[in-house]
Amino acid sequence: CHKGFAPLLPGFTYAEYNNLEDFKSKCDENTIGIMVEPVQGEGGVYPADPEFLKGLREFCDEKKILLMFDEVQTGWGRTGEIMAYMTYGVKPDMVSMAKAIGGGMPIGAMCTSAEIAKVFTPGAHGSTYAANPVCCAAALAEIDEILDNKLYENAKEVGAYFMEQLKSLPCVKEIRGLGLLIGVEFEKPIAFEVKHRAVENKLLITAVRDSIIR
């Protein structure tokens, strides 16, 4: 997954997704936090195992280190809850978010627990897309739209329908996901052909691997 992106940012150690023991083994006295996606989107939509995230929460509490969730792809209704961590009942110390929060406008945000927020002072946290008045107004309007119309409930309902219907296709090997964040893995490398056929029928999807669409 890191191919073409070297050199990677120093100071980070990478562990195997859904492997709690590997995460534990990579931590030492210098570790200040663990960052993880509740659902890995780019690799082909791989939801975290509930016990994996619960185990990370317990481990971070025990070692007094931060648990951070990257919800750029999963946040704000896409997975059937307002935020994906709510599906798991695991509350992180910090959450990064973007994409859906702006309704198409470029904006990112980071939320923390009240305890962590105490260490921030004006100017301590900067962002390329922070504080743009137009984007902030768009984000507030988008949040109202999501919450007032409970779009996350629609994502849960429609996502369940799609996943159930996809099961009947003989070419499908596996279906993974939460809400409307769905990955479909085929028996054969036909993902790009399926993508083009979908576009012809006015359905926007993406092929993340030769045999996986999202």
Model-derived features: positions:
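Conserved N-terminal phosphate-binding loop of PLP-dependent enzymes in the Aspartate aminotransferase
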Residues: C1-R214
